[in-house]
């Protein structure tokens, strides 16, 4: 490497690090907004977030950034850069080209709107009043449609949004794999509804104090390899994980004293996200590569933890006595087998994050269909509540009674995250495929859970997935780890085997 090459690379890395530092400050502000910032400070905080986001936007689309990218791309051709820097240039170029097409004033207005919209959504959800939130959502959708015209699209406008969260995934791919999954899930849901087996679920809805739930979930987090030296657990309306840096990865949860599953499984889910972020390779710190490679791969890790670990019978053989010690005595007459069946009960429900493993993908499909229709122009925002309710009835056979139970339950649209929801189902499919491959290397998977030893499992995930951050694309990771492309049958096989055993079908 020549002195000139070294200098331009060094200057570029310093410039990018400044952008990442602004991003860390923004993450801290978003975390604060959603974990208890005073209501009267929301408008000013939104102003600050808008200003800092605008600064990041300006830096990422500046002539200086453009010059760095052009110069470094010529060095890539001459093979004079490290692999990590090459990947960073590719990542920054993608963001540069995307953001350069959006006028700065429009971007700043959008970010301010988004910050305010999340607070309005929260209040609208509490009051179950979609009309309160509708004007904000209409503006967000309007902005997104305008942005798509700037970015361009292939075949479907929605494909552009999907690519932001899951490169390589399109409407055509999703229609195919969702169709495959639906063909096998829907008949199984019907079989279960006709099953005579009754699960003992009463204990799940008995009083379980918030403080005891918190202490129990803290114990589980330690067992699951969540590093409290590099994170913390807080309370919020809608659980999430947020990364400030790989040494500060925070998770939040929500407690319901009449249903402990919300906190326990929600926390395990967010733990999967956090463990991913905490175990990205250290040398990627301070670069745009120091995070999960896509939303789908990220969800594969959270769902792997929540379902393949947290809803596994062996996990509860280890932790059931611990649960009993923390609870208020409601599980004293319930065996671990009965408890396992109960927490895996399958029946249609209104709330996505409370859905069981089997019906969960159907919740995602509802949102996917609505988003497609919003962006192909066949559905208007004002008609969302009715359209939501109709699709819930079609897919799950139930109809929400109010907006909080229906269209207002998720924060994603308030944050402009259209194209994100399919990642949940993709993540589920990825996770099942990873688990199938992992068993070849760790055939004693269940025995490890029964011992409370999650470390070998976490280490396998780190070695094969976590450490790479964004240096590998999602479908590249899937192919490298499993030796094949996306295959929905692994998830369908897992669900059929599990639920036929539980319901004795």
Language model segments and positions:
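Post-HExxH zinc-binding segment in Zn-dependent metallohydrolases
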Residues: 291-332
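Contiguous, non-catalytic segments that form substrate-binding/exosite surfaces or channel walls
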Residues: 110-262
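Divalent metal-coordination and catalytic microenvironments
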Residues: 12, 152, 269, 302, ...
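Acidic/polar loop patches that form or flank catalytic/metal-binding clefts of enzymes
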Residues: 229, 283-287, 311-321, 381-382, ...
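All-alpha helical catalytic cores of prenyl diphosphate-utilizing isoprenoid enzymes
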Residues: 178, 182, 210-214, 220, ...
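A well-structured
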Residues: 2-167, 496-503
């Amino acid at each position: 490497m020549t002195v000139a090459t070294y200098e331009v690379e060094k200057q570029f890395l310093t410039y990018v690090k400044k952008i990442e530092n602004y991003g860390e400050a923004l993450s801290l502000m978003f975390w604060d907004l959603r974990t208890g910032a005073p209501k009267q400070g929301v408008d000013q905080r939104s102003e600050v977030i808008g200003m800092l986001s605008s600064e990041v936007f300006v830096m990422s689309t500046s002539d200086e950034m453009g010059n760095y990218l052009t110069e470094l791309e010529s060095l890539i051709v001459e093979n004079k850069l490290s692999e990590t820097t090459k990947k960073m240039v590719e990542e920054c170029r993608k963001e540069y080209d995307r953001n350069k097409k959006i006028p700065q004033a429009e971007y700043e207005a959008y970010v301010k709107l988004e910050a305010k919209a999340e607070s309005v959504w929260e209040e609208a959800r509490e009051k179950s009043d979609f009309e309160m939130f509708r004007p904000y959502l209409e503006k967000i959708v309007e902005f997104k449609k305008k942005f798509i015209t700037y970015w361009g699209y292939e075949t479907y406008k929605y494909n552009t949004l999907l690519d932001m969260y899951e490169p390589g995934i399109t409407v055509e791919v999703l229609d195919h794999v969702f169709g495959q999954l639906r063909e096998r899930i829907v008949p199984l849901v019907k079989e279960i509804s006709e099953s005579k087996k009754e699960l003992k679920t009463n204990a799940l809805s008995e009083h379980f104090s918030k403080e005891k739930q918190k202490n129990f979930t803290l114990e589980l987090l330690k067992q699951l390899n969540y590093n409290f030296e590099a994170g913390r657990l807080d309370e919020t309306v809608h659980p999430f994980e947020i990364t400030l840096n790989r040494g500060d990865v925070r998770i939040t949860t929500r407690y319901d004293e009449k249903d402990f599953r919300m906190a326990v499984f929600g926390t395990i889910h967010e733990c999967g996200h956090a463990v991913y972020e905490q175990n990205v390779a250290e040398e990627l710190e301070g670069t745009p590569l120091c995070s999960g490679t896509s939303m789908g791969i990220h969800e594969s890790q959270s769902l792997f933890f929540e379902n393949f670990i947290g809803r596994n019978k062996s996990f509860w053989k280890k932790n059931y006595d611990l649960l009993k010690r923390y609870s208020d005595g409601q599980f004293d007459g319930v065996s671990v087998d009965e408890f396992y069946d109960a927490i895996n009960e399958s029946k249609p429900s209104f709330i996505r994050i409370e859905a069981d493993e089997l019906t969960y993908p159907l919740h995602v499909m509802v949102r996917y269909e609505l988003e497609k229709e919003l962006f192909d122009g066949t559905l208007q925002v004002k008609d969302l509540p009715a359209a939501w309710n109709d699709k819930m009835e079609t897919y799950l056979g139930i109809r929400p009674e109010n907006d909080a139970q229906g269209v207002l339950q998720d924060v994603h649209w308030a944050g402009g995250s259209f194209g994100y929801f399919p990642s949940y189902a993709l993540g589920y499919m990825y996770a099942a495929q990873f688990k199938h491959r992992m068993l070849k290397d760790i055939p004693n998977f269940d025995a490890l859970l029964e011992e409370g030893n999650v470390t070998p499992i976490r280490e396998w995930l780190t070695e094969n997935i976590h450490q790479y951050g964004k240096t590998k694309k999602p479908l590249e990771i899937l192919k490298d780890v499993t030796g094949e492309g996306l295959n929905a049958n692994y998830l369908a096989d897992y669900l059929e085997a599990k639920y036929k055993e539980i319901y004795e079908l």
